Amino acid sequence: MVLPVKVLFVIPGEAQGSSMIFARRQAESLAREGVEVDLFHLRSRTSPWELARESARFRRRVRSFDPQVIHAHFGTVTALFAAWAAPSRPLVITFRGSDLNGAQSLRGVAGQVFSQVAALCADRIVCVSRQLRERLWWRRGSAVILPSGVDPELFCPEPRWQARQRLGWSYDERVVLFNAGHDPAVKRLDLAKEALALTQGLLTGLRMEVLDGAIPPARVPDLMNAADCLLLTSDREGSPTVIQEALACNLPVISVDVGDTVERLRGVRHSAIVPRDASAIAIELARVLRTPTRSDGRNKVGEFSAPRIAGELCRIYRELAAERSEDSAWNTSPY
């Protein structure tokens, strides 16, 4: 009988809300694969005093749960914290985007340096896209490419009118979905609005539905099925989960070349990669919106389905657990 692997996720931020929802959903997928997962939410990443308190809380969790593997779901301070607070436990780090390609501010550069140092401490490195892996200063060759993944049973196509009925939307309007998240400046909401205004000069009955961090995650599948198109204009991305969710629902996507969007949209009908220019975006939006045709993006869901990603992570965890078991006679630390 194979005993389940015990994995402790380290996730930045509070447990509530939509922040890092993809990490929590990944834990659910792993549980379905037989992995025993516990979640530790790192509440503060800036205050040394709070980090010291969090370290004590984290060590108590490690002692009580006794994980075979620790998985940090972000770089920067989150990954360094996991490496420092439990140095004898095998560590997996998933780099997700702004931890390796953040803003060129003092804080952004510091975060990138912390991420690069943390990469030296990891037993396994996961990057959500090839483009992000290229940002590593070292250990690129050993880093695994695994997007966050989406649940194909949660995100699946259904008639647009049914989704609109649940949301209370008009059946006649054209709706462009835009994910502003917690950082509208990086997502380039300004560019999206400029492109939409130009498109409104070409089409009538058009509006934008902007998603922010306050949108309940359970509502997102309905939004994907109710909208006519997803627009993505970000300056920086890792592997935007919103693109994967849209593809799983056959929602047409118009996106700039950022993160792994070119790879994700390659061969998908009724979707396009566009220059980061409002006029070019407007022309493509108008083309897609004139005919209410869905994409065939669901044909690609096998590349990023949650069960496939969970299976790959299970393999990594079991390798690390086996290595730790072999070394256990030499390690008496509870951390």
In which residue ranges do the predicted regions lie?
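Aromatic "clamp/platform" in nucleotide-sugar-dependent glycosyltransferases that forms part
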Residues: 235
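Short hydrophobic beta-strand element within catalytic cores of glycosyltransferases
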Residues: 243, 252-255
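Short His-centered aromatic/hydrophobic patch
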Residues: 72-78
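Active-site proximal beta-strand in glycosyltransferases
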Residues: 69, 85-102, 125-126
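Conserved acidic donor-binding segment of nucleotide-sugar-dependent glycosyltransferases
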Residues: 267-279, 286-290
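Short alpha-helical donor nucleotide-sugar binding micro-motif in glycosyltransferases
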Residues: 222-227
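Conserved donor-binding/catalytic core segment of Leloir-type glycosyltransferases
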Residues: 8, 169-187, 193-196
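Donor nucleotide-sugar binding/catalytic pocket of nucleotide-sugar-dependent glycosyltransferases
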Residues: 93, 116, 120-160
